[in-house]
Amino acid sequence: VPPSQRLLRAAEELFGERSYWRTTVADICARAGIATGSFYAHFDSKAEIFGAVVRQINEDLRKAIRAALETAGSGQRARERASFRAFFTLLSQRPWIDRIVREAEFVAPAVFREYYEHLTRGYARGVRQAQLDREVDARYDPEVIAYMYTGIGNFIGMRWADWTAGGQVPDDVVDDVLEVLRRGLPPLGPPARHVSS
């Protein structure tokens, strides 16, 4: 594994465990098994490697979603399920990544914004295609829907994967998310299957 990748992996783990502010370059180098002086051959600062970690998380997530979509089958609902499941699976494997991205809002605001712009751009393209295929109501702005998907995914993932230190988001939770996306929140309807307290 190249030294830069070892540093990125170590930095991701430490930023997730301790936060940006409580992690030092020396900590990252010790975890990576690399001399502290060698760090600066790859990154100029702790801030730079933090931005690189957030970008790597974004790339890993988009790659996981693309792979899931290749086997998702046809139809918007199948693609939505595959996308959510890919995110939740990555989050269960690396539950700290959501904390790192949230911290980026304050540590590296431009990187934080870039993260969500890249992520939602892909979702919006998928929604627009679903609108053209008449699977999603074309009256709604694809960007709005993309940010809704992202917000839902973030908070569901935080609750079931991050807060449980790597737990899986249950299938019935994913089913509920997809049903709400499909039907909205109508004022009347059949009784809910369950109510969480």
Report the location of each language-model feature.
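Amphipathic alpha-helical packing segments from all-alpha helical-bundle domains
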Residues: 59-62, 90, 108-135, 143-147, ...
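Amphipathic alpha-helical segments used for helix-helix packing
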Residues: 86-110, 155-162
